[in-house]
């Protein structure tokens, strides 16, 4: 405790604690998005698009596996192999000069997402291959995607995994159970149809909005089911035994 004499009077100066900068919260959000080689590149595209449109996400750390680049080329005709972020920006509808997306090489285990001391809100792997899911479940990662997911779990941040495989074998299911028990959110790429999608984007977006819900990212679409009574023109029938 410090003392100070001012004009003959003794004052006691109470100690103050400096606020640790890593604990300061902000309305601005940062996430890591990883894309792996499972089918469903459009899920990654629409997730990035809606995160960018949310108005609260200020940085997205993007990591892509080699297989993800190949699948995106086959499914969507886009070449993401270049390290130029302009291609990604165009793919998700951002201006070419946007700095929202920060690309990280798969082998760069010194990148921001590899450290728990770097503050961010969470991570999503979309789509998530069974190989990546298994590596995360085992804790024996070999690349930045695995490491970033491990960090997200150990720091008790939100980790969303979007597996896209069919059928699941017992190993896949056991890995998903293990990750769920560790705190991960498992959201299979299984879109619903009760919202009557008119095109593939509406079909995909229904699942993407659930991903954003679990990440805590606001969006403009209502995803809460309110019952058939709130849908005009619906006929509710019951069957009595």
Regions inferred by a protein language model and the residue ranges of each:
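Short, low-complexity, charge-dense intrinsically disordered segments
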Residues: 1-7, 11-22, 26
């Amino acid at each position: 405790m410090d003392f100070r004499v001012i004009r003959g009077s003794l004052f006691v100066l109470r100690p103050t604690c400096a606020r640790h900068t890593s604990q300061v919260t902000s309305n601005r959000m940062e996430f890591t998005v990883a894309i792996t080689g499972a089918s469903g590149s459009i899920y990654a595209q629409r997730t990035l698009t809606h995160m960018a449109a949310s108005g609260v996400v200020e940085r997205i750390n993007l990591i892509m596996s080699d297989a993800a680049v190949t699948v995106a080329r086959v499914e969507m005709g886009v070449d993401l192999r270049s390290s130029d972020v302009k291609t990604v920006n165009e793919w998700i509808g951002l201006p070419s000069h946007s700095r929202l997306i920060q690309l990280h090489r798969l082998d760069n285990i010194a990148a921001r997402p590899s450290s728990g001391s770097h503050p961010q809100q969470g991570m999503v792997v979309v789509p998530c291959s069974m190989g990546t899911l298994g590596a995360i479940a085992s804790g024996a990662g070999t690349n930045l995607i695995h490491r970033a997911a491990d960090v997200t779990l150990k720091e008790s941040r939100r980790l969303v995994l979007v597996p896209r495989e069919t059928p699941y074998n017992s190993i896949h299911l056991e890995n998903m159970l293990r990750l769920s028990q560790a705190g991960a959110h498992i959201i299979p790429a299984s879109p619903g149809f009760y919202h009557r999608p008119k095109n593939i984007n509406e079909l995909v977006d229904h699942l993407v909005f659930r991903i954003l819900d679990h990440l805590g990212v606001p969006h403009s679409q209502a995803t809460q089911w309110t019952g058939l009574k709130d849908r005009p023109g619906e006929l509710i029938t019951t069957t009595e035994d």
